[in-house]
UniProtKB/Swiss-Prot annotation:
This is Small ribosomal subunit protein uS14. One of its GO terms (cellular component) is cytoplasm. The gene is rpsN. Belongs to the universal ribosomal protein uS14 family. HAMAP family: Ribosomal_uS14_1. InterPro entries: Ribosomal_uS14, Ribosomal_uS14_bac/plastid, Ribosomal_uS14_CS. SUPFAM superfamilies: Glucocorticoid receptor-like (DNA-binding domain). The keyword Ribosomal protein applies. NCBIfam families: PRK08881.1.
Length: 101
């Protein structure tokens, strides 16, 4: 189990990313638009740097919904490999069975 503080940190990152999404996208479009004056683009870069680090969606980490484990996360199920295996062995995931050949 992940610490509660780590889970809370991820929730905070998600909330910040949603809050700053439109502002970040607007500034990033100004930065990448070559028809805008260089001085204005530079101001947009400086403004973007004033935003909190955690407002960037890149800093979010996928975590297991049951345990909070950050590694071996399977997107399809929203669980770590360990919890997927446990659920599959109990037959809780429809259509998933242990392979045999």
């Amino acid at each position: 189990m992940a610490k509660q503080s780590m889970k809370a940190r991820e929730v905070k990152r998600i909330k910040l990313a949603k809050k700053f999404y439109s502002r970040r996208e607007h500034l990033k479009s100004i930065i990448s638009d070559l028809s805008v004056l260089e001085q204005d683009r530079w101001k947009a870069v400086l403004k973007l740097q004033t935003f909190p680090r955690d407002s960037s969606p890149i800093r979010q980490r996928n975590r297991c919904s049951q345990t909070g484990r950050p590694h071996a996360f399977l997107r399809k199920f929203g669980l770590s490999r360990i919890k997927v295996r446990e659920a599959a062995m109990r037959g809780e995931i429809p259509g998933l069975k242990k392979s045999s050949w």
